[in-house]
Amino acid sequence: MRGISRLYWSLVLICFAFAPIVEASSVRLKELARIEGVRENSLFGYGLVVGLAGTGDTHRSKATLQSIANTLQQFGISLDSDEIASRNVAAVTLTAKLPPFANSGDMIDVNVSSMGDARSLVGGTLLLAPLKAVNGKIYAVAQGQVSVGGFSYDLNGNVVQKNHPTVGVIPSGASVERGLSTDLVGADGHINVILNQPDFTTASRIKNAINKTLGPGKARAVHAGKISVVAPAGEYDLVDYLTRIENSVIEPDRIATVVVNERTGTVVAGGDVTIDNVTISHGNIKVVISTDYQVSQPVFVREPGRGVSTVVVPDTSIDIEESVAEPVRLSSGASIADLVTALRQIKTSTRDVITILQLIKTAGALHAQLVIQ
């Protein structure tokens, strides 16, 4: 445990040692925002994976049997679902992302997930299946060999499994049949720039940078997450116009943030996070309750009466151990790294560090947004 604790504190100190490196610097607008209308669209579908070595859906998956019957019907073979018995087929759901500006003939990856009680999709092949958007229209068709990053083998009731063999992917397994139209210019004749992380200061700086690049009055900050830019009237090609916007240089502003992950005990903070004058005194109380059961056997001088019997008597003891709290004092302007170093010196546990950060935030001494995951 001592080695694990030493490793944890080493990692935390490394995080804070490099924190000043990630302070705000000048970046291009394309790293901070996107053009409205340029986005991915989700596609979904349903299909059958065939060629499984007895690891497909069982007869309990009625939807799979009906799907097999429907597929055979397309080839002129009429069978009732009750007449089908196969463990080499699995019903699957298909998901994919249609990228912006996709054209007919482009290939995209397809994720395949089992719907029924199949044990594995290893070695399976997806039959031709359509991929639809939320509007119900078909935008791509998928087919191909399923690649699974795991396996599952069952013999005489013994199962050996690695990762999730019921989920796979078909790289470049779907062909785009139609692309989605991308409207970069709105009905009002403006191009909207959407910030990845809305911030009023950053939005104002982006507006000023665009006006410096394109000319006064071209851009207007609508709110913290949106800047409206006048579309070119004809003197510029739209692509060249957007290129100039995307390559505008901005120094973004960001909120000082401390991120805490309670599950892993990780604490990450930027170099600009400071703490006011604060004194921390954190102690631990350990309560140990133990019970021993003693047998009470009465001594008889003569014949025992009716109310005399052997009984079990519990003997309970409570021990309380309180460790002496060692105070930690930090002066105004101290950083989170200073706090972690001070807590390391008094051998504070990971859980206590998280608790102390929460209390400092409650006391108003932590000038940062505390995010607990």
Swiss-Prot record:
One of its GO terms (biological process) is bacterial-type flagellum-dependent cell motility. Residues 1-24 form the signal peptide. GO terms for cellular component: bacterial-type flagellum basal body, distal rod, P ring; outer membrane-bounded periplasmic space. InterPro entries: Flag_FlgI. It holds the Pfam family FlgI. It is found in: Periplasm; Bacterial flagellum basal body. The basal body constitutes a major portion of the flagellar organelle and consists of four rings (L,P,S, and M) mounted on a central rod. Assembles around the rod to form the L-ring and probably protects the motor/basal body from shearing forces during rotation. Belongs to the FlgI family. This is Flagellar P-ring protein 1. It comes from Hahella chejuensis (strain KCTC 2396).
